[in-house]
Amino acid sequence: MRALSALAITLVLAAVAAPALAQGPPDPAARIARQQAAMKALSWMDGVWRGPAVTTRAGGQKITVTQTERSGPLLGGAVHVVEGRGYNPDGSTGFNALGIISYDPDKDAYSMRSYAMGQAGDFPLTLTPTGAVWTIPAGPATIRYTITARDGVWHEVGERVMDGQPPMAFFEMTLKRIGDSDWPSAGAIPPN
């Protein structure tokens, strides 16, 4: 009798699960279309940018570099890739970072995967009427980068924010758009 009950339960579970197993994976086209539509809000970033950037270190020492950014869509416009380089006065690279910005339709939220100075992380990015804000948790503080884009100028300010204290600016760059770029989508390897 027990064996018959176990068999009956197995058959019922198999019958219930069969329709779900028969379905294939969901068609990604609608999801990708939502990602592509959301990423159009960042199309102002596309191209090549250059200008001064100043970082203020602890103790007030200022480091000035020539900052460049190149930015563009990838995966058919479903993600946005940004590379930043800071050049020292002697022309050497003093800073290099890579960011991949994506949109999650399930969460209706943007995020940026950032790689810089041997570190990596996923950070929330929020669009604003004039650009974007992205934040990095840093112990009791939050590092907040506020980007303003207007008339071919990319202005970004980095601040250290702690509860009960005014934000402390430690980074500022003002870049001008100097041209178009087919990076990163150009140069794909052909099939033969």
State where each predicted segment sits.
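Bacterial N-terminal signal peptides that target proteins for export
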Residues: 1-8
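Cleavable N-terminal signal peptides
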Residues: 9-10, 20
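Hydrophobic small-molecule pocket/channel-lining residues, especially in calycin-type beta-barrels
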Residues: 22-192
